[in-house]
Structure formats: structure tokens, C-alpha cells
Amino acid sequence: MPLNVSFANRNYDLDYDSVQPYFYCDEEENFYQQQQQSELQPPAPSEDIWKKFELLPTPPLSPSRRSGLCSPPCVTVASFSPPGDDDGGGGSFSTADQLEMVTELLGGDMVNQSFICDPDDETFIKNIIIQDCMWSGFSAAAKLVSEKLASYQAARKDTGCPSPARGHSGCSSSSLYLQDLSPRASECIDPSVVFPYPLNDSSSPKPCASPDSTAFSPSSDSLLSSTESSPRASPEPLVLHEETPPTTSSDSEEEQEDEEEIDVVSVEKRQPSARRSESVSPPAGSHSKPPHSPLVLKRCHVSTHQHNYAAPPSTRKDCPAAKRAKLDSGRVLKQISNNRKCASPRSSDTEENDKRRTHNVLERQRRNELKRSFFALRDQIPELENNEKAPKVIILKKATAYILSVQAEEQKLISEKDLLRKRREQLKQKLEQLRNSCA
């Protein structure tokens, strides 16, 4: 922001003089030498260059989306309570409170809203923002805020001493401030048009909180609880309650504790009363919604069975579908039991090593048996009987040819046997005839 600007500075024509040494035309000057000569001159542009650009944006922006600043009347009621409200806070403004409110108003988006710069005002045309929007924006905003605070303090003094009926005086003062800001607040954009979900609770709108709780510092926990408690509620416009008294400091402290203790698990427990009222007495003409059941996380085992490509192919026939399903389920259960038995990664590593060792032993035994069977087959073939280095393919081919030759010889011998049997029968009959003739 510009240097040498304060709330007591009323001569806005001299604002440019304070920053005039920063700007120069084509004249070459030694600014650092001037600074050494004159102690009253502000620092050079290179030393304090970023402070020149800390100005408020001139064009008006949209209203703030924060829950504490979305409704200006609520903020006014919470911050300017009657003088007798010792519990609610804010009777006589201290210097710290005034500085905090002014800083919040100037730091947020509310300076650029229509309730500060009213276009219907006659002084708006002669405003110094229009005359010089580059250097006098902060001064004009400070002037407007100070005038607004002075008018509120004068209105509070006119109300007189507080009566014993503190609630009535609170309502009258709040209604007075709301009447002052109601036409300006109506010009703001309705947050329900921008947000699909309402910022307040769906069951009943809460009264505006005091500045100690959440008026100027809205927490993300409250927004989270409101959006998660009613995610399917229809968007409703924010309603300004004129007769709602400000809450006490004890209520605000309890609300702060509730908001600080919010976590992911207890978000759904924030609105028990609203859910009870909806379940007991639903409004007429509306359909009752089923209660949202909380999500339950269940543990499930993902089967990661891999095929052993090193194992020999199975020569047995395929099992039926039912038997195959039983075998698969048995494998899954066995894997689950094995996973449960593995208590630590060290034990799982030892089990894997044992399985690998047993697999290697079985594979070695299988290869040795296959080699012995080939050697036995080679010994049965006459051509390869003495050839110890005969490959397995030659052994198989010679064995096949030898088997075929042996089978052919077998058939030949069987036919010869049949002929000999017939010859025997004939000889027996002939011998019997000779015996009968001799007798």
C-alpha cells in the first residue's frame, strides 16, 4: 500500500506527492545520492518496490464465499451488540477490537461490495476512487470504514442506557443495524445460486455467532459437517433473521470446542437432533428419506495364484466343472491359511525357500528316473545296445521300429502255431482210424 497513509489523513490531493519521487521521465537522476542527502525522502524504488502494488482492486468483486462473510447483516449483529451485553461481547469497543474489525473488512472482499460504495449515493460520483483509482483507493476505503464505524457508535449511543430487559434492547438494536444494511445486502449475489449445497444446516438455521467464535474466522470443519450431513438437500437461500439475539460467549466456546474436535469418524454424528426430528415427524407433503447407512470396510483376500510353468504338463483328463470349482476353492482356502500362518516377512521368506528347495529335489528325482528309463529302453534295442552316447530321439525311433518288427514276427508265429495245431488234430484223427482197423 502507499506510504504515509493513515486514517487521520484527510487531504487526498497530497497522496500523489508522497510517492512522486518514485516516478521520473527521461531525466537521469541519482536517487541513491538524493536519499543520502535528504533523510526525509522515502527509500528508493528498488528497496521498497513491492509496497507500491499493495493496493486494493478497484473493480467491485463478488461477495465472499466464506460462511462468516456471506451475510453482512449477521456479521453486523454479531459484532455490534448492545452496550449491556457483557456475555455476547462487544459493548464498548476497545482499540484492539476496532483494529481487528477494520483489518478484517479491509483485508477481505467486503470493501469492494456494494454496501460500502453505494452507487446511489450522491458523493459516489465525487468519490476520490473515481478521481484517482491508482493511488487513493486505500485512503477512500479507510475513510468510508471510519465513517461507518462512527455512525454505528453514534447510533449505539442514541439507544441510551441498557434496561433490565436485555433481550428487547438487543432485538431493537440489531433491527436498527439490519435496516441500515438491508438494502445494501439485497444487492449482493445469493450464495445459493453459486453453491448447490446450503452453507447452513437443513433442519434449522443457526443464529449468527459472536466475533470470538466464527464471525470473522469460518472454519472448514463447519462447512465439511454441513455438506456431509445433508449432501442431497435442495439448495435453500440464506434467510436473514432480524430478531435473532447474538449468542453468548459460553455458547461460542462450546461451538469452538465442537469444531476443534471434529474428525473424519465423528462428522456424521454432528446432526443427531436434526435426524431425530426428521425420523419422528416428517413434514407434510414430503417423502421420508431412508437414513444413510455408514460405510463398512470389509477385509477381502485377492487370489494371486500363479501357474508354475516349470512343472510338467498334466496327462490326466480334465475334471468336471463341480470338482474343478471345489479344487479351486480348496486352493484359495489353503492360500488364505498359508497367508495367516505367515506372521512376519522373515517366516514367509523361509517358507518360500523351503518350497523352492523341495521343488528342486523333486525335479531332480524326476529327471533321474527319466534318464534311467531311457537307458533301459536303449539296452533292449539290439542296434543301440552298446551305444552309450545315443541321443534320446534316436533311442525312441529305433525303439519304435524294433517294436513294430517284433509285433510282425509275433503275428507270423501265431499263424504258424495255428497251422501246427491243425496238423496235430489231423494226425490224431488218422492215428485213431489206424487203431480201429487193427483191432
From Swiss-Prot:
Main location: nucleus
Keywords: Acetylation, Activator, Chromosome, Cytoplasm, DNA-binding, Glycoprotein, Isopeptide bond, Nucleus, Phosphoprotein, Proto-oncogene, Transcription, Transcription regulation, Ubl conjugation
Span(s) of short sequence motif 9aaTAD: 100-108
Composition skew (Basic and acidic residues), residue ranges: 266-278, 315-331
Residue numbers of N6-acetyllysine PTMs: 143, 148, 157, 317, 323, 371
Function: Transcription factor that binds DNA in a non-specific manner, yet also specifically recognizes the core sequence 5'-CAC[GA]TG-3'. Activates the transcription of growth-related genes. Binds to the VEGFA promoter, promoting VEGFA production and subsequent sprouting angiogenesis. Regulator of somatic reprogramming, controls self-renewal of embryonic stem cells. Functions with TAF6L to activate target gene expression through RNA polymerase II pause release.
Name of this chain's protein: Myc proto-oncogene protein
Source organism: Marmota monax
